[in-house]
């Protein structure tokens, strides 16, 4: 489980890990049920010690789940780097994670798996971080899939000054909308 969230300024995974760790672990348990010989590894960067401590406490009784504390460095959350950090296996550009015997899912994906299997709820929303110097009230919001950017900015109190750039995703790997 990719809990690295290595993109600067993004905090949605961090909040989910703090507020709903049981759902994250529940989703991972469902995945492990489908692959009985597999081992679950929850990878979290060391700049989130509160999350690491909480997850370690919650997985203590689980024989097939561990929490791996990663050094905080970019791009630690990149799939290939995460696999190498967790397993020591190298995944080159022509390979898929499955070629290394791995599945990498992020915090929101395993939470969505839990919600779908446990409660029959489809993925209808996601947590997004709205931040930056131009944002009136930087915050994380759970919003419906497909919400307009203008509505999202309105929820954050609008802009306090003109934005020089709007990026969808993180500043390193995201896409500049303008």
Where are these regions (language model features)?
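Cofactor-cradling patches in redox/metallo enzymes
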Residues: 14-22, 46-47, 146
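Major-groove recognition helix of helix-turn-helix-like DNA-binding domains
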Residues: 166
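Short connector loops at secondary-structure junctions
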Residues: 6-7, 30-34, 41-45
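A structural-propensity feature for long, helix-poor, extended segments
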Residues: 175-178
